[in-house]
């Protein structure tokens, strides 16, 4: 299983992010989820908001991150003025 994790230090505007999430859900081959970070085991969490795409396998992941739809999500987030996120790619066993 592969994931793209998107971590925001500050929570984006809820209405604008709901519109952005619709675009994110169009990335082929994956499932998109997002929500507030609610805590951490040691003090305040480092991030306020989390989003992810989940892909069943490497082929679906590689295809998705090269897709026009995936590229459009980054452009849309920038145009909306969302706080710059940390984006990481994960392989899970």
Predicted regions and their residues:
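C-terminal structural segments of small proteins and small subunits
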Residues: 62-89
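Short S/T/G/P-rich N-terminal loop/turn motif that feeds into the first structured element of a domain
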Residues: 1-66, 88-93
């Amino acid at each position: 299983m592969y994931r793209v994790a998107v971590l925001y230090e500050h929570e984006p505007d809820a209405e604008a992010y709901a519109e952005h999430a619709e675009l994110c859900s169009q990335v082929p081959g994956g499932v998109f989820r997002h929500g507030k970070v609610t805590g951490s085991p040691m003090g305040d969490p480092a991030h306020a908001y989390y989003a992810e795409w989940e892909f069943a396998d490497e082929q679906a992941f590689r295809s998705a991150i090269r897709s026009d739809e995936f590229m459009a999500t980054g452009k849309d987030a920038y145009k909306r003025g969302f706080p710059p996120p940390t984006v990481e790619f994960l392989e899970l066993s």
